[in-house]
């Protein structure tokens, strides 16, 4: 392989060391072009006609990536890798998900015809596109750089892209055996797809991965389960860990992408996978980036567990304190570089380390006057009726907390027949039950599947009450406008919140992602 990276062999050796939990790698997530002397005289292609050409025209992308790599810095351990990703989790598109090109990324929407059957069609246009794109890039690269493996993803994340996150979370409760079968089917297809794409992009046995622009001397993959932030440790060990372990056993070099503080409780299960080589940490929105002291203990746990670590978006100011605290063995630094001067500063720093309630009785006797005794008797009667109502409605509360739809509906029917006011059913029992579920979630005793099941049970019961509330302001609990702010392209959490709010009786106006303030006000 003739390459534009002059120190490629040194970087390869550092990667081999890192996969074996030794040494430091100094790189960055992608590349920068500021002040970089081009490695070849390559002109960029004409601007893409539209988003479709920008993402889904293999020849245009191959020409663009050829120009991009030729003008990118390859200092330190930054690798020449063409980023061929077709959206996060593009295995879902191969299995029938729908592509949509955006300005900065590709979205994969659920398959409207998905019927829970996991089917690989070797003639599917999205599968053919993957192969055509990689072949076009490989031909254009001509040995000057690696063609990266697309971000296929796997498991629950792929299934969520096919049928919707909320439906997958419900499946963990409603059809767990079916879900396990689907996880195995997705894994089997993953290996088939991976191997065929590997044969296109490989350089001998070597390969690179588009995310983190990383390299290995054999097959390598980035593994993940972003949806795992919403499930319990028991569910993770049932629906995620066995299939991640199988990937680690069949792929030579594996890096797990641990995404967000909500996923940290799964670290023990990851460390149990002996074959897993390394763990990458992404703190998530609202958290300090990977070089923060907040994550030192996390990195130490990963390293102590026998895995190498990848820290992302580390700044120059954070670099030395980070290495002082976690050591200099098995550490992959994805720096926040902007120019080659910053790379040189980081290299000098690295050299320092590489060189060296109570019941009321009805027969109460008082000495009160007759009128006051009558009032007391009336109070007792009201309390008795309230107690009877509570006895009647307690099963509704229990059903919603347990996420049981049919019992919730039956109890609501009985309550309507007994004359219990719809407002009392909603305010006194449904909302109270959802409050209990929310508290359990906050305490770590329930997870998103349990929230969704409870919302589903309440929504089913609420449907019986809506006709009785027609024309009443209480027909819905309230109206909520939901969307992600301008610049935020994440919609999984937003859609889950919208689903749960609807289940609780709110009218939800979902205005989508990347929404300006004006559109929020207009809605």
What are the residue ranges of the model-derived segments?
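Glycine-/proline-rich flexible loop or hinge segments
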Residues: 41-55, 114-120, 436-447
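A gly/proline- and charged-residue-enriched helix-loop-helix capping module
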Residues: 104-132
């Amino acid at each position: 392989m003739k390459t534009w990276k002059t120190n490629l062999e040194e970087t390869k050796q550092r990667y081999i060391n890192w996969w074996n939990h030794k040494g430091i790698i100094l790189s960055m997530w992608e590349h920068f072009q500021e002040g970089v002397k081009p490695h070849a005289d390559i002109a960029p292609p004409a601007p893409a006609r539209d988003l479709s050409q920008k993402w889904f025209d293999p020849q245009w992308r191959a020409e663009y990536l050829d120009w991009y790599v030729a003008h990118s810095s390859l200092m330190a351990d930054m690798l020449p890798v063409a980023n061929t990703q077709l959206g996060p989790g593009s295995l879902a598109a191969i299995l029938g998900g729908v592509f949509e090109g955006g300005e900065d990324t590709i979205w994969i929407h659920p398959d409207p015809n998905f019927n829970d059957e996991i089917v690989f069609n070797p003639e599917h246009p999205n599968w053919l596109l993957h192969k055509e794109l990689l072949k076009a890039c490989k031909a254009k690269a001509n040995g000057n750089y690696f063609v990266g493996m697309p971000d296929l993803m796997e498991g629950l994340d792929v299934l969520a892209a096919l049928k919707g996150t909320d439906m997958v979370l419900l499946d963990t409760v409603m059809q767990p055996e079916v879900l396990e079968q689907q996880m195995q089917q997705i894994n089997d297809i993953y290996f088939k797809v991976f191997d065929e794409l590997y044969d296109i992009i490989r350089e001998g046995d070597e390969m690179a991965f588009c995310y983190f622009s990383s390299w290995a001397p054999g097959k390598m993959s980035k593994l993940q389960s972003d949806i795992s932030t919403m499930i319990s440790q028991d569910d993770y060990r049932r629906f995620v860990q066995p299939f991640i372990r199988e990937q680690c056993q069949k792929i030579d070099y594996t890096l797990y992408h641990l995404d967000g503080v909500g996923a940290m409780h799964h670290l023990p299960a990851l460390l149990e996978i002996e074959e897993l080589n390394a763990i990458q940490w992404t703190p998530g929105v609202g958290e300090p980036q990977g070089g923060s002291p907040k994550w030192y203990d996390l990195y130490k746990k990963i390293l102590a567990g026998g895995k190498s670590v990848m820290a992302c978006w580390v700044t120059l100011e954070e670099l030395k304190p980070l290495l002082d605290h976690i050591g200099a063995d098995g550490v992959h630094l994805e720096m926040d570089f902007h120019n080659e001067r910053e790379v040189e500063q980081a290299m000098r720093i690295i050299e320092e380390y590489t060189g060296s309630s109570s019941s009321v009785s009805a027969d109460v006797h008082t000495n009160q006057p007759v009128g006051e005794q009558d009032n007391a008797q009336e109070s007792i009667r009201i309390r008795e009726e309230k107690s009877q109502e509570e006895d009647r409605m307690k099963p509704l509360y229990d059903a919603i907390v347990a996420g049981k739809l049919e019992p919730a509906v039956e109890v609501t029917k009985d309550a309507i027949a007994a004359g219990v006011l719809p407002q009392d059913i909603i305010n006194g029992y449904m909302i109270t039950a959802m409050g209990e579920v929310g508290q359990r979630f906050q305490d770590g005793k329930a997870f998103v599947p349990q929230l969704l099941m409870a919302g589903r049970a309440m929504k089913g019961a609420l449907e019986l009450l809506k006709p009785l509330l027609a024309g009443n302001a209480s027909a819905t609990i309230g109206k909520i406008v939901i969307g992600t702010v301008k610049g935020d392209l994440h919609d999984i959490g937003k859609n889950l919140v919208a689903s749960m709010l609807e289940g609780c009786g709110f009218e939800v106006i979902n205005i989508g992602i990347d929404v300006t303030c004006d559109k929020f006000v207009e809605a």
